[in-house]
Amino acid sequence: MELFWLEHKKLWRKKIVKIFVLLCFVYCVIFGSILSFQWFGFGSSDDYTSAFGNNFDGYTVIKDSQEYALSFGGELTDETLQKIVSDYQQMEADGMEEELEKTDWQIVNSWLGTLYPELRDTSNYKTMISYVDPDKLTGFYERRQQVLDEFLEVSGQVGAEKEFLHQIERKVEKPFHYEWVEGWSTLLGSMVADLGVVMALFLGIVLSSLFAGEWHDNTSTLVLTTRNGWGKIALAKILTGLAFTVELFALLAVSNVISQLFFMGTAGWDMPIQNIKLIAVAPMNMLQAEIYEYAFVLLGAIGFAGIVMFISAAVKNNVLTLLLSLAVVYGPMMIAEYLPYEMQKALDLIPLVGSSTDIFRTNTFRIFGKLIWSPYLLITIPVLIGILCMPFAIKSWSRRMKA
């Protein structure tokens, strides 16, 4: 334990580590959460050419939007949808531009495009919510089921796979609970979902020198001759890397949740994620989805840390270690679109390469003839990969120290 604390202190004493942790915090929390809520994400529009032209009044806009959504009764029915659309059109006709910003028009417009494509007027430059006849918006849940079936057919998900997904979807409670959706859509679609991709960069920078740095700092001889030996020190380094990963995640996650609670409160936590994407099959509400996404980031980060430490133990050069570590995450992302679909899904199992937003999709894996919904594997396989890399990191460190 003493060795762990020594390694832990040594890592945190490095000025470069403190600088990069601060940069990560500024990017993910200050810009990615606080300023996104207050300014360029939800601030009222002043300059429609750029989100950075928004006013610094996101808190007020969010609270007004939540209050407005509550006026529609809480349950999403045909009548609710008709009332939402009718109210929007009335405000637009009255020239109430500022009032329109507190509506869920982007979300509702996506519902209309998905469920009522025959009502789309291609000659009209306006969005559907501006011109569609509210009286024709009927059969919301029947149409949703039809669209889901058609999507599965087009995706080639038929037979046993289709029935498997339907079994999951049947657990979704209907009618949907409705409150303000846009905030949760942004939170789950980008704020939390993109956290892992950013963490990968900073974890790669900090952890790449954990083992390789001993040669760079000319301390390898000292490590070799210490009474503790390479084995205990290697274990202490791995525990230090894991601790740093969890600490960085906790710093970002706790700060983001505090920011979220300040701006959004807990309103809408029990809405189904189908309010964001109608054809999602997961029986999850917004809070459950957020917990899943944070678990995805944490477990993926631990898995990635294991890979980085293995590379650091196997490679003496800090820069090469960093490049190889970053290539593990960003390489597959760059080439994925050029690969067959099944290979893309396989690459998603690499730590932090996949996306927590798979809970909105219908992806599955077939393993030993058994169908498994992709989100289950996306939070288990990456961390297992990282854990498996750790013993190899110790062995690799051993060979190099003995050499």
Predicted regions and their residues:
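Hydrophobic transmembrane alpha-helix segments characteristic of membrane transport
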Residues: 217-221
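Central hydrophobic cores of alpha-helical transmembrane segments
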Residues: 21-25, 319-332, 350-351
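Short hydrophobic, aromatic-rich alpha-helical segments embedded in or entering the lipid bilayer
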Residues: 343-364
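Secretory targeting signals
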Residues: 26-83, 133-214, 235-314, 318, ...
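Short helix-to-coil transition segments within interhelical loops
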Residues: 224-230
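Residues that define the loop-to-transmembrane-helix transition and helix capping
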Residues: 18, 231, 318-320
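Aromatic- and glycine-rich beta-strand/loop motifs that create alpha-glucan
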Residues: 1-20
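Junction motif at the cytosolic side of a transmembrane helix
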Residues: 5-7, 11, 310-314, 381-403
